[in-house]
């Protein structure tokens, strides 16, 4: 799918809203409660977009977003923590033209 397709089919606005919500949900790697919050948020987004909530598992004390075999055609491999300590990034979310800046915008 090209960026033109994203705009053409009306997906750009909800995609950007989801990305912004994930970025604004600060989740430093070592803050397990904050990581749980971002995993719950990702599950809420998945439920809205795909109609299927993720199972949230705890593996070695860390929250994991898991679909299992419910959507075998989808592979999502990512990290959801924004890594940086709370308040490290200012502004947390910034859009200038077609450039978005913030923790995790490239790989969330």
Where are the predicted features?
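Acidic/His- and Gly-rich active-site-bordering loop/insert found
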Residues: 2-104
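DPxDG-like acidic metal-binding loop motif
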Residues: 108
């Amino acid at each position: 799918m090209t960026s033109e397709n994203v705009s053409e089919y009306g997906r750009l606005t909800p995609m950007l809203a989801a990305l912004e919500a994930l970025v604004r949900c600060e989740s430093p790697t070592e803050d397990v409660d904050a990581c749980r919050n971002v995993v719950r948020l990702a599950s809420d987004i998945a439920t809205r977009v795909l109609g299927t909530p993720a199972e949230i598992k705890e593996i070695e004390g860390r929250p994991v977003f898991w679909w299992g075999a419910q959507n075998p055609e989808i592979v999502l491999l990512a990290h959801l923590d924004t890594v940086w300590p709370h308040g490290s990034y200012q502004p947390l979310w910034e859009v200038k033209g077609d450039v978005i800046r913030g923790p995790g915008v490239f790989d969330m």
